[in-house]
Each structure stands twice: as structure tokens, then as C-alpha cells.
């Protein structure tokens, strides 16, 4: 519906309208109104079709991540797979490989291919802190689901050290330290004990 009267607007005006609509959807998602994932995915698809998501000819890594996240939440795994390949080279070279690899890992995880996801996470170089921590969190989930408590314990220790060494600021630090603490608690109450 946003693009029904696209001819009345310049590309820049369409881009601004599109971003307003996407930001609304993201705010709704952030307050647990998950039905807006479908709205967001529709907006992303239309934006890709109309080129309103490109900035200076590039698709930002954040937009790429958000598109993948919306697609995965909507269960559109095949579409996400095609999107990732089609738009990989639309990202700036600096973040291209790590962003692509991380999102490939998320797709593998969504498909239940945990070992494949882990392999993708372990081979990529995540110099970007905003990507490194989510990659570590995904690895944490995989170790837990693979029932590997020793590996998980080592991962938690390394992750805590990383967070303290990098001096992660604000709520990121708190959120990831809470994730570590709660996972550690799960380990100590023997959740891996199937008896």
C-alpha cells in the first residue's frame, strides 16, 4: 500500500516514507508485537524491489541483518536463502563476508543444522563488536542444544573474558553478562542430566 502512489514521490521521498514505516514496525516488534515481522518483511521486499533501501548504492549491514531476521521469524527460509545470495555484494566490502557468514549461520540454525551453523560461526572473523557478541550468543545456544556442557562452560568463560576485555558499554554489556549468568545457572542445576 505504501507504494501504490509511488509515482507521486521522488525516490528520496519514497525512501523516507519507507524508513518511517519500517521504524514503526521495528518499534512494534521491540515491544513484543511479533505480528509486525510480516509487515516489516513485506516492506523490506517492496523496498528491495523499488531500491529504496540502498544508501549511496549500498545495502547497510544493519538492513541486511534485519531483513534476514524478519524472514526467519516469518518462516521464509527459502526466500531468506535467495535474498542472502542475491544481496551479499550489495553490502560494503568491509562487512560483507562476516555479515554474510553470520546470517548463513542463523539460517542453518533455523533449519536445525546446528553443526553447519557452528562451522560458519567458527570460520568467520567477527571484528565488528555488534556482530561478534550475537555470534557468540548463537554459538552458546548451539552448544546448549547439542548437549555439550564442557564446551559450553569453556565458551561461557571465554565470552565473559571477552566482554570484560572489550569493555562493552551500556545495556549490551548487561544483557550479555545476564545471558552468561543465566546459562551458567542452567549448567549448575544439571539440565543436561537426562535422568
Mark where each language-model region is.
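"A position-specific structural signal for the A-helix of alpha-solenoid helical repeats
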Residues: 20-24, 62-66, 99-106, 110, ...
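Amphipathic alpha-helical repeat scaffolds of TPR domains
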Residues: 11-31, 57-69, 99
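Long, ordered, amphipathic alpha-helical scaffolds
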Residues: 157-195
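Solenoid-like repeat scaffolds
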Residues: 3-14, 45-57, 85-95, 122-131, ...
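Specific register positions within alpha-helical solenoid repeats of the TPR/Sel1-like families, i.e.
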Residues: 26-30, 72, 109, 144, ...
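Helix-turn-helix repeat elements of alpha-solenoid scaffolds
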Residues: 1-3, 32-45, 71-83, 109-118
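Loop-centered beta-sheet repeat module
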Residues: 37-47, 51-72
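Active-site-proximal binding-pocket segments
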Residues: 98, 112-138, 143-155, 162-163
Amino acid at each position: 500500500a505504501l507504494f501504490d502512489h509511488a509515482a507521486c514521490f521522488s525516490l528520496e521521498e519514497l525512501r523516507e516514507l519507507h524508513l518511517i514505516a519500517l521504524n514503526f514496525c521495528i518499534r512494534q516488534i521491540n515491544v513484543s508485537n511479533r505480528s509486525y515481522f510480516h509487515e516489516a518483511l513485506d516492506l523490506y521486499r517492496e523496498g528491495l524491489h523499488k531500491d529504496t533501501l540502498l544508501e549511496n548504492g549500498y545495502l547497510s549491514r544493519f538492513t541486511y541483518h534485519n531483513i534476514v531476521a524478519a524472514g526467519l521469524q516469518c518462516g521464509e527460509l527459502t526466500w531468506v536463502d535467495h535474498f542472502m545470495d542475491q544481496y551479499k555484494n550489495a553490502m560494503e566490502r568491509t562487512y560483507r563476508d562476516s555479515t554474510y557468514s553470520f546470517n548463513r549461520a542463523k539460517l542453518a540454525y533455523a533449519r536445525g543444522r546446528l553443526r553447519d551453523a557452528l562451522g560458519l560461526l567458527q570460520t568467520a572473523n567477527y571484528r565488528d563488536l555488534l556482530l561478534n557478541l550475537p555470534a557468540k550468543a548463537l554459538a552458546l545456544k548451539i552448544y546448549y542444544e547439542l548437549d555439550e556442557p564442557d564446551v559450553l562452560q569453556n565458551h561461557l568463560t571465554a565470552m565473559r573474558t571477552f566482554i570484560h576485555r572489550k569493555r562493552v558499554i551500556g545495556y549490551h554489556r548487561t544483557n550479555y553478562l545476564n545471558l552468561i549468568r543465566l546459562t551458567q545457572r542452567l549448567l549448575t542445576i544439571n539440565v543436561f542430566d537426562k535422568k
